């Protein structure tokens, strides 16, 4: 076959498969995956080296990391979540891509990649920014979720319209095979529209508003797309065999529950468990659910939850203004 024929054949293949070819190789893409961007301090316990950085400066930090680059880091607060998300991938279907976003340089970041290799985590893509904010790479990778220990980085990602959370220290580890993720509702899955009414007018005004708007779907919040991506993976399995289980854990109670249920129905998104707690502390309920991770917009709720499960603060909405 001549060169012209080979070019035509490649064009036919690209047309049939939706892939572009360059020199006979398919062009890599993340478009069909759930993309999780995670900082090195969320994935591993870097508390000792971070203390050196804050107390002694960047030069001492760089020396420490290089001197200890063969020492394996202990798992961090989001390690179990990442491990379980990567476990969703199958030989015939790669659902999840995890991206490392680190303020290390590539040189000092070698210890992180040595630890990734040690634990057998399938993470091959990374951005090392040498002290600069990592959040600018969240859109570039098409991330559905960004987890970091840096609140300002998280806020920037949220401002750009991406699901993001500041991880809290936690010793909780759920070693079951099933991935269990819990979400607060207002300002997380949903917008903070209803929360603003509560903050300005109190519980009675909030209840009146939600009863009157019960059949009006709530606008989406920053975690809607991430929840939808999880639901898309769930839809590949029979309900009783899904490797993912989700829960809505909200301070709402009746009658404010109806609008939430109808909103999820309009979105065609399945939530496996819904806990309407009417203001009760969420920690024990999250422990009972067995959450691998919980997302909430109110810091006090996250601090309480972190005593029982791994948790992240979503600094978004009226409660964080």
Q: Where do the PLM segments sit?
A:
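Leucine-biased recognition of intrinsically disordered, low-complexity hydrophobic segments
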Residues: 8-9
């Amino acid at each position: 076959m001549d060169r012209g024929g080979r070019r035509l054949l490649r064009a036919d293949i690209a047309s049939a498969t939706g892939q572009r070819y360059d020199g006979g190789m398919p062009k890599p893409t993340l478009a069909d995956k759930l993309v999780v961007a995670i900082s090195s301090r969320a994935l591993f316990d870097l508390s000792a080296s971070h203390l050196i950085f804050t107390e002694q400066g960047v030069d001492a930090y760089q020396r420490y990391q290089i001197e200890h680059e063969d020492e394996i880091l202990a798992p961090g607060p989001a390690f179990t979540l990442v491990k379980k998300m990567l476990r969703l991938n199958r030989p015939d279907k790669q659902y999840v891509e995890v991206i490392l976003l680190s303020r290390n340089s590539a040189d000092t970041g070698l210890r992180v990649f040595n630890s990734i290799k040690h634990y057998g985590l399938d993470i091959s893509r990374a951005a090392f920014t040498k002290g600069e904010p990592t959040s600018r790479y969240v859109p570039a990778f098409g991330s559905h979720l960004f987890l970091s220990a840096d609140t300002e980085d998280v806020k920037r990602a949220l401002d750009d319209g991406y699901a993001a959370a500041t991880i809290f220290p936690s010793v909780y580890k759920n070693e079951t095979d099933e991935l269990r993720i819990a979400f607060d509702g207002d300002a997380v899955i949903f917008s903070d529209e209803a929360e603003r009414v509560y903050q300005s007018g109190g519980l009675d005004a909030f209840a009146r508003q939600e009863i009157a708007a019960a059949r009006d779907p709530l606008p989406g919040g920053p975690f809607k797309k991430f929840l939808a991506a999880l639901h898309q993976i769930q839809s590949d399995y029979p309900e009783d065999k899904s490797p993912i289980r989700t829960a809505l854990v909200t301070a709402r109670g009746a009658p404010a529950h109806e609008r939430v249920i109808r909103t999820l129905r309009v979105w065609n998104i399945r939530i496996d468990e819904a806990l309407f707690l009417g203001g009760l502390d969420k920690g024990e309920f999250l422990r009972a659910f067995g959450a691998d991770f919980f997302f909430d917009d109110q810091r006090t709720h996250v601090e309480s939850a972190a005593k029982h499960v791994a948790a992240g603060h979503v600094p978004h909405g009226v409660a964080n203004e």
